[in-house]
């Protein structure tokens, strides 16, 4: 009987250890984002009439961007963590122009874009896939941030010959990255609800082996901004 009790106590101890190990593993699986480790951020301001903006993660100022469709370089910052508050503030003040929370993973690259005005101001945050395109190709994604009537619905992005690169992109959303031939300079944006109303747009030539984000913007006229990610 004594041996049986000893054996049962050993089983209980093993079970407790196993249960504790599973608990730690579950916590790790549920919370893959570490606080305060390094990540890289690129900041873009396409908000019309916003004035110059300071960019914050939490209470830390990361950089400043002008109101003239400016893009920063990637900036390394120890700002990873869940539910991190990202803010654009009127430069040199505590006045918040737009604010949003994001989960920021360590050792990742992100682009944050400010758009809109007043109560419609918003921040689009995207994790950037900076893996190299195939040799001789460029990699590009498309962002729909135009409130102009000509692009007020979801839009398709295509080559000038009609080949679709991204379909049904909502306002405030981005496509996945796609590979295209280097040298691309012409794009067509087509409203999904009005396929006969095609908008032809020009961009600077995309270089081979580089990675880009094309932003469609503008409140009265549709225009583009080309951001180089890598």
List where the protein language model places each region.
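Sec-dependent bacterial lipoprotein signal peptides
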Residues: 1-26
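Intrinsically disordered, low-complexity polar regions and short flexible loop motifs
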Residues: 5-7, 24-230
């Amino acid at each position: 009987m004594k041996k049986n009790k000893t054996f049962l106590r050993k089983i209980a101890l093993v079970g407790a250890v196993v249960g504790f190990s599973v608990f730690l593993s579950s916590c790790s699986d549920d919370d893959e984002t570490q606080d305060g480790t390094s990540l890289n951020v690129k900041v873009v301001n396409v908000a019309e009439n916003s004035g110059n903006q300071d960019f914050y993660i939490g209470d830390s100022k990361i950089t400043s961007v002008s109101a003239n469709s400016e893009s920063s370089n990637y900036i390394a910052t120890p700002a990873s963590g869940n539910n991190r508050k990202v803010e654009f503030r009127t430069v040199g003040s505590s006045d918040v122009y737009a604010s949003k929370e994001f989960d920021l993973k360590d050792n990742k690259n992100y682009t944050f874009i400010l758009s809109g005005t007043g109560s419609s101001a918003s921040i689009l945050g995207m994790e950037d896939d900076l893996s190299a395109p195939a040799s001789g190709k460029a990699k590009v994604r498309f962002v729909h941030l135009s409130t102009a009537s000509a692009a007020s619905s979801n839009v398709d992005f295509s080559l000038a010959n009609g080949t679709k690169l991204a379909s049904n992109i909502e306002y405030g959303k981005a496509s996945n990255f796609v590979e295209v031939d280097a040298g691309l300079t012409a794009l067509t944006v087509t409203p999904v609800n009005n396929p006969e109303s095609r908008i032809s747009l020009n961009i600077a030539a995309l270089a081979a082996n580089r990675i880009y984000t094309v932003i469609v913007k503008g409140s009265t006229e549709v225009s583009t901004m080309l951001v180089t990610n890598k």
